[in-house]
Curated annotation (Swiss-Prot):
Reaction equations catalysed: L-homoserine + ATP = O-phospho-L-homoserine + ADP + H(+)
UniProt-listed NCBIfam families: thrB
Localization, UniProt: Cytoplasm
GO molecular function annotation: ATP binding; homoserine kinase activity
Binding residues annotated for ATP, in chain numbering: 95-105
Keyword Cytoplasm on entry: yes
One biological process term in Gene Ontology: threonine biosynthetic process
Disulfide topology: none
Keyword entries, A-Z: Amino-acid biosynthesis, ATP-binding, Cytoplasm, Kinase, Nucleotide-binding, Threonine biosynthesis, Transferase
Protein name: Homoserine kinase
Function: Catalyzes the ATP-dependent phosphorylation of L-homoserine to L-homoserine phosphate.
Family designation: Belongs to the GHMP kinase family. Homoserine kinase subfamily.
Gene of this entry: thrB
Length: 314
């Protein structure tokens, strides 16, 4: 049975950005970062009103095809509730198409907002964290960014074949508590990157020794992120995707080289073009100034908790 939500319920979802891969953990490792989109959803008597402020406001659709709206509708359906109308306000701070998980954050934020509306009506209904990971990953097609935004901290994520052929894969993730000394800095170029394009640069087959290398570094990354940050340089090495994408990301590749030569563990953030740097030391002022002079935004970011939802009654 579907329950109709009363008019005047309002929730705010605050959802973090994320960085995927972290070097060796292609489509597996993710990290939640302290840069947030806010999604305010209010139930109304009829229709859909959507407003978008900040990043991407001029580029995304202001209607039912907006990813946040589709995620809200999917979340309401999964929670067994329905709204006669919705007012949706998106306040975006996460840059779009830069490798910081903006689409995953939109999906997670919309689903979490829908879950908040359901639980505002009845605390016994709604979606579990596992369901939020599953549903948001279905939008993405892989769970690394989405699960990081749901759970916070660092995540190891994976997928399994569906129980019924034709269904969605089963997506799962386990949260890692990041060592408190680790700091994150994102160097964000102005140009955008297409995930589809950069994925298209990857070979279908890889040498066994490269697969073995990345398996070892992915395991080491778990140790480095949680207990041994002194191992971050080795733990962020990769042979499967960064060099292959380098021709499409010249500025990114150059800055990864600059930072690693300076002893800072740097990787492509997701599909790029953002550079993610992880360290236990403050980011060098001279490198920050040089990056800005090269047209990069320098964002010093906390390691974030997962999506948060607050509820009010209008």
């Amino acid at each position: 049975m579907t329950i109709t939500l009363p008019i005047g319920l309002s929730v705010t979802a605050r959802v973090p950005a994320s960085s995927a891969n972290l070097g060796p953990g292609f489509d597996t490792l993710g990290l939640a970062l302290g840069l947030y989109d806010e999604i305010v959803v209010t139930t109304t008597d009829s229709g859909l009103q959507i407003r978008v402020e900040g990043e991407g406001a001029a580029d995304v659709p202001w209607g039912p095809s907006h990813l946040v709206v589709r995620a809200i509708e999917r979340g309401l359906e999964a929670a067994g509730v329905w709204a006669s109308g919705l007012d949706v306000l998106c306040r975006n701070a996460i840059p779009h198409s830069r490798g910081l998980g903006s689409s995953a954050s939109a999906a997670v934020g919309g689903l979490a907002a829908a879950n908040g509306l359901a639980r505002a009506l009845d605390a016994e209904i709604g979606l579990t964290e596992e369901q939020l990971v599953q549903l948001s990953s279905e939008f993405e097609g892989h769970p690394d960014n989405a699960s990081a935004s749901v759970l916070g901290g660092a995540v190891v994520s994976w997928s399994c074949p569906p129980a019924v052929e034709g269904d969605e894969p089963i997506y799962s993730a386990a949260k890692l508590d990041v060592h408190p000394d680790i700091r994150a800095v994102a160097l964000v170029p102005e140009e955008r990157s297409s995930t589809a394009h950069t994925r298209g640069l990857l070979p279908e087959l890889v040498p066994h020794q490269d697969a073995s290398f990345n398996a070892s570094r992915s395991a080491l990354a778990v140790v480095a992120l949680t207990a041994r940050p002194d191992l971050l340089m080795a733990a962020t090495e990769d042979r499967l995707h960064q060099a292959q994408r380098a021709p499409a990301l010249p500025l990114t590749t150059r800055w990864i080289g600059i930072l690693r030569e300076a002893g800072i563990a740097a990787t492509v953030s997701g599909a790029g073009p953002t550079v993610l740097a992880l360290s236990t030391e403050p980011f060098p002022v001279e490198l920050a100034e040089a990056a800005r002079a090269d047209g990069l935004r320098v964002l010093e970011l906390d390691i974030a908790d997962g999506v948060e939802v607050s509820t009010t009654t209008v």
